[in-house]
Amino acid sequence: MQEQYRPEEIESKVQLHWDEKRTFEVTEDESKEKYYCLSMLPYPSGRLHMGHVRNYTIGDVIARYQHMLGKNVLQPIGWDAFGLPAEGAAVKHHTAPAPWTYDNIAYMKNQLKMLGFGYDWSRELATCTPEYYRWEQKFFTELYKKGLVYKKTSAVNWCPNDQTVLANEQVIDGCCWRCDTKVERKEIPQWFIKITAYADELLNDLDKLDHWPDTVKTMQRNWIGRSEGVEITFNVNDYDNTLTVYTTRPDTFMGCTYLAVAAGHPLAQKAAENNPELAAFIDECRNTKVAEAEMATMEKKGVDTGFKAVHPLTGEEIPVWAANFVLMEYGTGAVMAVPGHDQRDYEFASKYGLNIKPVILAADGSEPDLSQQALTEKGVLFNSGEFNGLDHEAAFNAIADKLTAMGVGERKVNYRLRDWGVSRQRYWGAPIPMVTLEDGTVMPTPDDQLPVILPEDVVMDGITSPIKADPEWAKTTVNGMPALRETDTFDTFMESSWYYARYTCPEYKEGMLDSEAANYWLPVDIYIGGIEHAIMHLLYFRFFHKLMRDAGMVNSDEPAKQLLCQGMVLADAFYYVGENGERNWVSPVDAIVERDEKGRIVKAKDAAGHELVYTGMSKMSKSKNNGIDPQVMVERYGADTVRLFMMFASPADMTLEWQESGVEGANRFLKRVWKLVYEHTAKGDVAALNVDALTEDQKALRRDVHKTIAKVTDDIGRRQTFNTAIAAIMELMNKLAKAPTDGEQDRALMQEALQAVVRMLNPFTPHICFTLWQELKGEGDIDNAPWPVADEKAMVEDSTLVVVQVNGKVRAKITVPVDATEEQVRERAGQEHLVAKYLDGVTVRKVIYVPGKLLNLVVG
């Protein structure tokens, strides 16, 4: 064994061994308990970043630990390979998205191998290959036949200059990112999957997910947004149709003083024919894309349509306004306004001088003061005719019942959740498998024409999708009749909604899933990824699992038993102000810093001498230029050091602050482990350990070893507090470094201890542990070695610490045998100099003894 720890020499050797031996390849084995450990698959952007490394290290630690417990562990990896960034990169680098993507996959695969992750590479998949997306296309056609897929027009961002649809992130300040033309809202036909048909189940089954973070479950509950209320129909004077609104507060209905409709509502369109002000307002609304998050903060605007609706209970005429806070795609595109008891309605009514009518009493029973704001709390009704004096629940039911009896109301359960629009007007995605015949009939692509293959040899102009630009691509025949293919592609969330299931049978040719394999491995035992995926991906992931269950492919209700959301990786961020006042962000690697005595950064400059402003720790990002390249760190310290730091620096679900000093600390620790094993093995063979012949000191050290095994096992297995597990191993290492190594049993004990340490560290730092296990003459490869088991007998304390007090003041702490009697403890206490001093010449009036803990002598 060489004396120095040289990761650059051992890591590549161990990785080659794993490759050649196919160590992590698994198949179904009914005789073994399975464990499916999955990290969210990466987008092949070109290089791994520290967020990836953290995510995949956590997964690898768990997978290796479970493997050492003797389970059949599946840990696969693949590539979420479709998506918009590839199109931009292809234009920039004068290539096509496919070669750019495949090059990135090859590069990043090497980076993953360099970090020593134990993946079953035989199951690797890339979602951009026809072998993968053909089954997604087939499944979509099945969903269409089941009535779970439909087409309807929906608003998109449209650049009139480029004649193309833009994603929300391509709209900068209302203009096209490429040509700066003002973006319009345009209605185009798009495909939707009926996720709303599963809304109740998606909501209710959250209660089954005991091992998912509450934050994620709450976000999904709010996103699904189930509410109970009443749908109310209003007659409108001089208008051919009625208006329907939905409210969750029918108790406030007698305070409804106006209605508001979306700018795109047919009533507003009709009114605009003779109202130029309204027409201009509708135009303005059409071209403002409003995300729901911005709705709350934006200025509320509206125009009176001139139409009057009739309040069904009071018979009063109330105005109908067009307002920018009502969205056509939500509900009916019309809302009832109760400005006395809804703050948004109140602000709008105050701005435009509309009637505000209070109908709910304040908590103290007085009439509410509406001079500053609405009263939004529930309470007792007044000013409401026959409903006066009713509380919220009674009023809700009474008004709902009356409206229902009159035929103008209906109790309804509503959802915030909208159906999933899966059409994208981009090129680099899976083609949607639908065709249109010459007579306008729309139908699914027949099975014998699947997959609909996306051509990869294309020229990107950065504007139009190549399959939209080439009229020949869309032409096909179905049942001998000419037809046109759909030129939209799937939302890339489609591919990531079912990949976890395809990993169980990536080569399966007969269908989407081999149910036997899928049901052996599924559900996933632990799924690891960022909390930013809480609603979109993790909701579609759950939805797809239920769709596959209802298609008879899987036999479970939920895709993953446990979800672990790892924290973000933060790093120092610095900038200097340029000549034009712009911020130039400087990589922390290039910052020369001065620190105070507490280690805080007080001054910084770069190599060019710019004074740098230090903005603290923030998420590693391109925009702040504060990402640290994992590859550079691995080349400098070795993969094991980077992995150990990642797991030690912070609990897995909290943010991690990147500190190179911490990385150096992790590296020093591994050097210490190496050195101790080197010194131990240099002394030659070791005798067998005889636990019955150990001295008190040897027993105490062995107790520490086995207590550490018990703690680390609990920390990794049950608590998943990996940082405290590592801390416990480090503490044990400090004791081992000071332990005597001269006697035969000293060395036998050291052998047992080091074999335990190396196995406990193996999930974190597998390369060094693989090597040290061989040096310690461990049986077989460490990859197949069992996890160490704590010896209960070794952990039993044979002595205990007793605190000795005289008149309640601590005078000594003594070590006594566990089974010592009170007399023996008193006798031993009397031998202590300080205790004897305070007992000299006085009478012991009372003795308080708590066995094994406390002896208090009361003297007078």
Curated annotation (Swiss-Prot):
Gene3D superfamilies in the record, alphabetically? 2.20.28.290, 3.10.20.590, HUPs, Isoleucyl-tRNA Synthetase, Domain 1
Binding sites annotated in the UniProt record for ATP: 622
Q: Name one GO biological process term.
A: leucyl-tRNA aminoacylation
Q: What EC numbers are recorded for this enzyme?
A: 6.1.1.4
What species does this protein belong to?
A: Shigella flexneri serotype 5b (strain 8401)
Give the family from UniProt. Belongs to the class-I aminoacyl-tRNA synthetase family.
Q: What is this protein called?
A: Leucine--tRNA ligase
Q: Which GO terms describe its cellular component?
A: cytosol
Motif extent ('HIGH' region):
42-52
UniProt keywords (A-Z) are: Aminoacyl-tRNA synthetase, ATP-binding, Cytoplasm, Ligase, Nucleotide-binding, Protein biosynthesis
Question: What Pfam families does the record tag this protein with?
Answer: Anticodon_1, tRNA-synt_1, tRNA-synt_1_2, tRNA-synt_1g
> Does the keyword field hold Nucleotide-binding?
yes
Q: Where is this motif: 'KMSKS' region?
A: 619-623
Q: Which PANTHER family match?
A: LEUCINE--TRNA LIGASE, MITOCHONDRIAL, LEUCYL-TRNA SYNTHETASE
Q: Where in the cell is it found?
A: Cytoplasm
Among the GO molecular function terms of this UniProt record, one is: leucine-tRNA ligase activity
Q: Which NCBIfam families match?
A: leuS_bact
